[in-house]
A protein has these predicted regions:
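Glycine-rich phosphate-binding loops that contact phosphosugars or nucleotide phosphates
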Residues: 55-161
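Short alpha-helical segments and helix-capping/turn motifs at coil-helix boundaries
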Residues: 48-49, 123
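Generic non-transmembrane alpha-helix signal with a bias for helix starts/N-cap capping motifs
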Residues: 47-48, 141
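Extended, charge-enriched "interface" segments that sit outside catalytic cores
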Residues: 1-46, 52
Length: 161
């Protein structure tokens, strides 16, 4: 039988549970910015009105490299059945993306430094001024920040947690 050797008393280790609860209390007492970002009272560093113009968009292109889009891609893959929008993740230099250029996309360009070569190349190939573009980058002068200004696109400043 599969349940041989499994005893319910093994799941009732209150001492360890209380130890975990105490550790959690200590973490919550610290004013860690990442933990604070999960609270209902957290204030974003941007105006959420910026995001409203993307509500009507059906297709999104996320342009970035490595950690800049891996988390987003993981969340999308996990919730794919529930998400009603289409996402195309562009995280390398791929010739096949040129075929997708004709479709209408809203572009989310993500680069913490704003100087990642592959992101800049894909940005120059895939975006134009008539697209809906949203840049997520540090609040400093970088190539990506200057492109956002040139395209008159919205910029959300990347937080350094």
């Amino acid at each position: 039988m599969i349940t041989n050797g499994i005893y319910l008393k093994n799941f009732k280790l209150k001492r360890k549970s209380s130890k975990v609860a105490n550790i959690l209390k200590v973490i919550l007492k610290k004013k860690d910015p990442i933990i604070q970002s999960l609270s209902k009272n957290f204030k974003n560093s941007f105006d959420t009105k910026i995001l409203r113009k993307f509500n009507s968009s059906r297709n999104f292109r996320i342009i970035g490299m490595g950690g800049s889009i891996l988390g987003t891609e993981a969340i999308y893959n996990f919730l794919r059945d529930k998400v009603k929008k289409n996402f195309l993740f562009i995280n390398d230099l791929d010739v096949s993306i040129m075929n997708k250029k004709k479709e209408k996309y809203s572009n989310l360009i993500v680069s913490k430094s704003g100087e990642t070569i592959e992101t800049i190349v894909n940005l120059n190939i895939l975006t134009n001024k008539s697209d809906k573009n949203l840049f997520i980058t540090e609040n400093r002068k970088s190539y990506l920040y200057e492109m956002a200004e040139k395209l008159k696109a919205e910029v959300i400043h990347h937080n350094n947690f």
